[in-house]
Amino acid sequence: MRPLKQAIYSSRTADKFVVRLPDGMRERIAEVARNHHRSMNSEIIARLEQSLIQEGALGEELSMRLDSPELSLHERELLQRFRQLSHRQQNALVSLIAHDAEMAADAT
């Protein structure tokens, strides 16, 4: 089992899918995304991913254990420190990293 790699891509190359939202849902998603310091897209992706993880649909690779031999020492330390953060801090950090990755991809 290989560790999950975070794909770096720009919005131009990302897979796109149109979703029809019920009345008022767009505004609710926007508000929640603001509270989590994320874009609406990042909020939707995070919630879909969490739902799929809970159902077991994304497989074991996303539930990497700290004692996994596939984790390097640095990855293990990052994961351990990440898990010590509050949920809000985790969301902010993930949002920051995703934003930086998008900016780097757009610069190329």
UniProtKB/Swiss-Prot annotation:
Protein name: Transcription factor AmrZ
Function of the molecule: Functions both as a transcriptional activator and a repressor of multiple genes encoding virulence factors as well as genes involved in environmental adaptation. Represses genes involved in iron homeostasis. Modulates intracellular levels of c-di-GMP which in turn regulates swimming motility and biofilm formation.
BP-aspect Gene Ontology terms: negative regulation of DNA-templated transcription
UniProtKB keywords: Activator, DNA-binding, Repressor, Transcription, Transcription regulation
Alphabetical list of Pfam families matching this protein: Arc (PF03869)
Presence of keyword RNA-binding: no
Superkingdom as given in the UniProt entry: Bacteria
Gene3D superfamilies: Met repressor-like
Signal peptide: none
Disruption phenotype: Deletion shows increased swimming motility, decreased biofilm formation and very limited ability for competitive colonization of rhizosphere.
InterPro entries recorded: Arc_DNA-bd_dom, Arc_rbn_hlx_hlx, Ribbon_hlx_hlx
Keyword Transcription regulation included in the entry's annotation: yes
Single GO MF annotation: DNA binding
